[in-house]
Amino acid sequence: MKKLVFTLATCCIMCACEQKTETNPFFTEFRTEYGAPDFDKIKIEHYEPAFLKGIEEQNAEIKAIVESRETPGFENTIVALDNSGRTLARVKGVFYALTEADTNDEMSALSEKIAPVLSEHNDNIYLNQDLYKRVAAVWQQEQEGKITLTTEQHRLLDKYYKAFIRSGAGLDAGKQNRLREINKELSTLAITFSNHVLNENNAYRLVIDNEAELAGLPEWVK
């Protein structure tokens, strides 16, 4: 009897997880015209699981690049890096567009919660020494004329190489750790400041106690 109850409970949990996966619109490509977000299907509870799943997926993709036994090349390193993190990019694009244009208290709270998580994830990519070495190797190949890239390919390589440099990939371990701390703190402070500004703007009221000051306005505005 206990075994039956345990089996049924396990099945219920698995079904719930499967249903949650199937109903989260961020877990698959948007099936709308032009790939526009399914705003009518997106709910506040979808964002955090999508952020975490997106981070998990990109970590696995980065790991595959780093652990590749192939010689670093444009396709297996730069293109693979550029193609990583599709789920994360999808949820970030929608979430931050809405927090800028149509936010609410729940969205603001989530943005403060997820900011340091995303900051850490970004540092884990651009301070990853093994990944940086592969990107730098491809960049060096082009500098030495060992590979020929199109204008678009060169632009992509240059973008990622400079992103690693500017993100501190060339710093020693101690400075990188300090940079991680600063980035994490800045990510939280930036969101907190933005939310404070928004709250102040929303709380603003203009009191007009002299009707003459409304001269020139249409009647329907008055």
Residue spans of the language-model regions?
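Bacterial Sec-dependent N-terminal signal peptides
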Residues: M1-E22
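Zn2+-dependent metallopeptidase catalytic domains
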Residues: C17-K222
